[in-house]
C-alpha cells in the first residue's frame, strides 16, 4: 500500500490532506506534537480507505525524521510521499524578531523539512513525491512576519533544488503556496479587520480558501496526474498573487501602514 508521511497532521491543512490521501487509498503516517489532537484526528479517519498511523513527536527534534520514516517502513514496508506541512505564524516585523523566534521559525519550517526530506530520499522507491507547504508570503512581500516569509522562501529554494537533483531518479518535488486559509493557526489574525480586508478584498475569487482547496492541490501534485510537473511552486490563493485586483471597499479604505516607530523606517 502506498504510504505518505504528513507533518502537522492533527488539524487544518495537514488533517485535510491526510483525509484526502486516505480517501484515495494511501496509508498515512501523521506527525504532530499534540498527542491528544493527533489521536482525535486518527479516530476521525477510522472509516476511510486506508490506515492512519499517528506519530506524536516534535519534528524539530534531532531524532524525529529518522523515527518517522522508520515507522512508515515498519507499518507498510514503503514510503512514497512526503508532505512537509507543519508550520507556525507570527506577525512580528524584522526589527522586533529576536534570535529565539528566528531560530524557532527556521527550525520548524526549513531545517525540519530539509531533514525529513533527507531521510525520505533514502527510503523512497522508484517513484515518489515531495510536496512542501509554502506560502504566498514567500512569493510577495508583506508588512510583517519577516521570519515566516524567510523560512518559507527558503523552503521554495529547497523544493527547486530537489526537483533538479532527484528528478532523474523518479522523485518529483513541488510546493504549494496557500493564501490565507481559515485554520486554527490563522484564526487570531482573521480577527483583525485590516488583515481580513488585505487578503479577502484582494482575492478575485471573492471567497476564502479552504483547507480542502489546499489538500486537493497537494494530492494532485502527489498523484500520477501531475507526473510531468516538477520543481513548481503552485499558488493556491484564488488569484491573490496574480493580480492587483481590489474591491471598491478596499479602494475606499483609509491607508494605515506607517510604522509606529519611525526609527526603523529608513528615514
Please place each PLM-identified region on the residue numbering.
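Conserved glycine-rich cofactor-binding loop
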Residues: 10-12
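Short, small/polar-rich loop/turn modules that mediate ligand/substrate recognition or access, typified
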Residues: 83, 167, 172, 229-231
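Substrate-binding pocket helix/loop in short-chain dehydrogenase/reductase
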Residues: 93-94, 98-106, 199
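Active-site helix of classical SDR
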Residues: 117, 151, 159
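Alpha-helical segment proximal to the catalytic Tyr-Lys
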Residues: 122, 164-168, 227
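Residue(s) in the substrate-gating loop at a strand-loop-helix junction
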Residues: 135
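C-terminal helical subdomain
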Residues: 175, 194-229, 236-238, 262-267
Amino acid at each position: 500500500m502506498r504510504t505518505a508521511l504528513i507533518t502537522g497532521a492533527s488539524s487544518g491543512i495537514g488533517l485535510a490532506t491526510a483525509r484526502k490521501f486516505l480517501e484515495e487509498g494511501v496509508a498515512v503516517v501523521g506527525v504532530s506534537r499534540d498527542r491528544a489532537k493527533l489521536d482525535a484526528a486518527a479516530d476521525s479517519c477510522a472509516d476511510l480507505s486506508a490506515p492512519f498511523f499517528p506519530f506524536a513527536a516534535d519534528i524539530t527534534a534531532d531524532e524525529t525524521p529518522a523515527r518517522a520514516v522508520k515507522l512508515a517502513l515498519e507499518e507498510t514496508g514503503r514510503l512514497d510521499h512526503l508532505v512537509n506541512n507543519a508550520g507556525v505564524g507570527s506577525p512580528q516585523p524584522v526589527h522586533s524578531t529576536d534570535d529565539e523566534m528566528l531560530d524557532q521559525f527556521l527550525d520548524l519550517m526549513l531545517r525540519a523539512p530539509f531533514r525529513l526530506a533527507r531521510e525520505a530520499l533514502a527510503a523512497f522507491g522508484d517513484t515518489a513525491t515531495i510536496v512542501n507547504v509554502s506560502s504566498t508570503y514567500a512569493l510577495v512581500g508583506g508588512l510583517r512576519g519577516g521570519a515566516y516569509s524567510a523560512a518559507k522562501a527558503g523552503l521554495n529554494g529547497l523544493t527547486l533544488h530537489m526537483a533538479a537533483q532527484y528528478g532523474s531518479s523518479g522523485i518529483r518535488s513541488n510546493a504549494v503556496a496557500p493564501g490565507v486559509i481559515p485554520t486554527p493557526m490563522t484564526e487570531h489574525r482573521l480577527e483583525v479587520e485590516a488583515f481580513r480586508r488585505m487578503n479577502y478584498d484582494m482575492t478575485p475569487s471573492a471567497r476564502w480558501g479552504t483547507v480542502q482547496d489546499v489538500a486537493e492541490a497537494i494530492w494532485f501534485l502527489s498523484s500520477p496526474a501531475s507526473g510531468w510537473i516538477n520543481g513548481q511552486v503552485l499558488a493556491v490563493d484564488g488569484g491573490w498573487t496574480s493580480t492587483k485586483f481590489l474591491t471598491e471597499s478596499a479602494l475606499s479604505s483609509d491607508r494605515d501602514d506607517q510604522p509606529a516607530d519611525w526609527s526603523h523606517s529608513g528615514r
